Amino acid sequence: MAEITAALVKELRERTGAGMMECKKALVEANGDIELAIDNMRKSGQAKAAKKAGRVAAEGVILARIGAGFGVLVEMNCETDFVAKDAGFVGLANEVADYALANKGTSIEALQAQFEEKRAALVAKIGENMNIRRVQYLEGQVIAQYLHGAKIGVLVAGQGAEEELKKVAMHVAASKPDFVNPEDVSAEVVAKEREIQIEIAMNSGKPKEIAEKMVEGRMAKFTGEVSLTGQPFVMDPSQTVGAYLKSVNASVTNFVRLEVGEGIEKVEEDFAAEVAKITGGNA
């Protein structure tokens, strides 16, 4: 039997865009013949799936699961909102979330490998690129979850009544804090913002000494704006989230927020341009 080298697997991946495990399996079955492996992958539909791999998958779903003392969020992407509601796509996403819950701490790479065969088969069937993009675990004494549709998912860990922490999870979904408390804001973030604020003050004609004094007040406001407990509570803007938590005898130790497609640049074309491209400009 021919030796299946890492270089051979790499070449097949580059030529087909398929996953590592699929490429290795195809090469083993083809006894190391890369051209035969490609032919077999085309016949099985894996090559079709590979052709979709370069397309932007910025739609999809966020799913949440709660276990004993921990929770998990999973993001699975596809190309269109229509497919995000497809029973096959949603079913696979739920399988992934259930597996992540049952196998606490599973890495995104392990999840992708576990479900690659099913993912490729679904891509071949539906005709859209899709992928398991992110998995986030959160541990805590009490875990609350909130899903906004299937587009935003939040887990909050802390102490107190779960229903109160769920309200805070809803706030996190709406207000996107970066830190739990003002004092948690990193020195690097504070230094960068201070530099920006001093520059703004000096550009307005203030001497540097006065600008630096003005900035101290602005920095206190800034750290409150980017931290959960310093933000006005969306359900009662007259008080901060920190004040609300204190009033219900609860506290937050950490949170995780995922939003479908965040950080992915969507490629958008107008309809006329798309038609012109297809017809070679002879619409």
From Swiss-Prot:
Source species, domain of life: Bacteria
UniProt keyword terms in alphabetical order: Cytoplasm, Elongation factor, Protein biosynthesis
Subcellular location: Cytoplasm
Record's keyword annotation contains Cytoplasm: yes
Keyword Protein biosynthesis found: yes
Main location, first listed in the record: cytoplasm
GO cellular component entries: cytoplasm
Gene Ontology MF term list: translation elongation factor activity
Chain positions covered by the region annotation Involved in Mg(2+) ion dislocation from EF-Tu: 80-83
Pfam families in the cross-refs: EF_TS
Family in the record: Belongs to the EF-Ts family.
NCBIfam families for the chain: tsf
Name of the protein described by the UniProt record: Elongation factor Ts
Organism: Glaesserella parasuis serovar 5 (strain SH0165)
Taxonomic lineage: Bacteria, Pseudomonadati, Pseudomonadota, Gammaproteobacteria, Pasteurellales
Gene: tsf
